[in-house]
Structures are given as structure tokens and as C-alpha cells.
């Protein structure tokens, strides 16, 4: 009996689960400082790495799995946070932004003809900006002033830029070691 239901191959499912677990492990490193109840954490590099290594579809799926498990109560976020509270507090926009972060990073990496450090730096930076695109305005709404939310979010930028470089280096090494991990777009012939 064949249906129209598509299935995820076992290897892809394993990659999604392992990366969701990896992002959860990054949450074991305690957050510190931050602004308006949003801590500075290592965990936000996980979605960027997921997109950079697994591509947009599997990377986004791994983040969605982590967020779903968190929402049902597992304490998978930095500081042992879980349940619905993180999704309605000051971190909410950044958490939801993780989905967009993995998606944007993964799309750029998958569409790139090469997976060199400069390409991966651009992809990872774009993923970070995608997270900020959602996180900063939501933080602004929580603190009661969009501009204030933007300014307060600037405290995250230096550390996040270091994490972006680290993610790009790791992803470059992974793609160098496993060049067929993601399909590469076909090169179009040059017209002379």
C-alpha cells in the first residue's frame, strides 16, 4: 500500500535527532549576563551550525524538534529552561528566530557552488541576522520600546560574531571532510 506520505530516510532522521541533541547539549553551558532576561548563551550557535552542516531542511527540522521538546516541558534550553514560559518571555523572538536562522544559513550553503570559509562565513552571518530580525523586535515589545530592544540587543553582537566565525570554521572542516554531505548545485556552462 503506497500513500502520498513522504518519509524521511533513516540517515536523515538520525542527523536531525543528533543535531537536536547537540543543540540541547550546548544548553548545558550556563548563560550569563544579557539584557532584559535574555542571557548570553552558547546554544544559539547550534541552529546556525545545523543549517550550515545539514542544509535548510534537516537543519530547520532539528531546531523544530528541539523547540517542540522544549515546549512540552523538557529543560533543554540554557539554564535548564523548558515548557512554554521561554516562548512567551523576552527570549521568545530569539528562540523562534532559531528556525529562520537554520533555514537561511542552510539555503545559502546549499545553493553555494563551493563550501569555502568565506561562503560559510556569509551564510552563518546571514543566519545570525535572521535570528536578530525576529529576536530584537520581540525583545523590544517585551521591554516596551522597540528602539530600546534593539539597543539592548547590541550586547549580544560581539560574542555572536565570535560564534559565527567558529561555526563557519567548523562547517568548513565538516564539508571538507564530507564533501558529499549536501548536494552541490550543478555548474552552468559559461557563455563566451
Residue spans of the language-model regions?
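Interfacial aromatic-anchored transmembrane helix boundaries in multi-pass membrane proteins
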Residues: 27-39, 67-101
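Hydrophobic transmembrane alpha-helices
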Residues: 1-60
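Alpha-helical transmembrane segments of multipass membrane proteins
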Residues: 23, 27, 62, 70, ...
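Structural signal for the C-terminal ends of transmembrane alpha-helices
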Residues: 53-57, 104-112, 173-178
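Glycine-rich, small/polar surface segments that engage phosphate groups of diverse ligands
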Residues: 53-75
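Short helix-perturbing small/polar motifs within transmembrane alpha-helices
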Residues: 16, 25, 84-131
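Membrane-embedded alpha-helical hairpins and interfacial helices in multi-pass inner-membrane proteins
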Residues: 36, 80, 112-192
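Hydrophobic alpha-helical transmembrane segments
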Residues: 13-18, 45-49, 59-65, 91-96, ...
Amino acid at each position: 500500500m503506497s500513500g502520498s506520505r513522504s518519509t524521511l530516510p533513516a540517515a536523515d532522521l538520525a542527523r536531525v535527532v543528533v543535531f537536536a541533541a547537540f543543540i540541547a547539549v550546548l544548553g548545558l553551558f550556563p548563560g550569563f549576563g544579557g539584557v532584559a532576561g535574555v542571557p548570553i548563551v552558547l546554544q544559539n550557535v547550534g541552529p546556525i551550525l545545523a543549517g550550515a552542516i545539514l542544509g535548510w531542511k534537516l537543519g530547520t527540522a532539528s531546531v523544530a524538534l528541539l523547540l517542540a521538546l522544549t515546549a512540552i516541558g523538557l529543560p533543554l534550553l540554557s539554564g535548564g529552561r523548558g515548557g512554554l514560559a521561554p516562548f512567551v518571555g523576552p527570549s521568545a523572538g530569539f528562540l523562534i528566530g532559531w528556525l529562520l536562522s537554520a533555514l537561511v544559513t542552510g539555503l545559502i550553503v546549499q545553493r553555494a557552488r563551493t563550501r569555502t570559509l568565506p561562503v560559510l562565513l556569509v551564510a552563518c552571518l546571514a543566519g545570525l541576522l535572521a535570528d536578530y530580525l525576529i529576536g530584537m523586535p520581540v525583545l523590544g515589545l517585551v521591554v516596551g520600546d522597540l528602539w530600546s530592544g534593539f539597543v539592548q540587543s547590541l550586547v549580544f553582537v560581539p560574542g555572536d560574531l565570535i560564534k559565527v566565525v567558529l561555526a563557519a570554521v567548523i562547517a568548513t572542516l565538516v564539508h571538507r571532510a564530507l564533501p558529499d554531505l549536501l548536494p552541490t548545485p550543478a555548474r552552468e556552462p559559461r557563455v563566451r
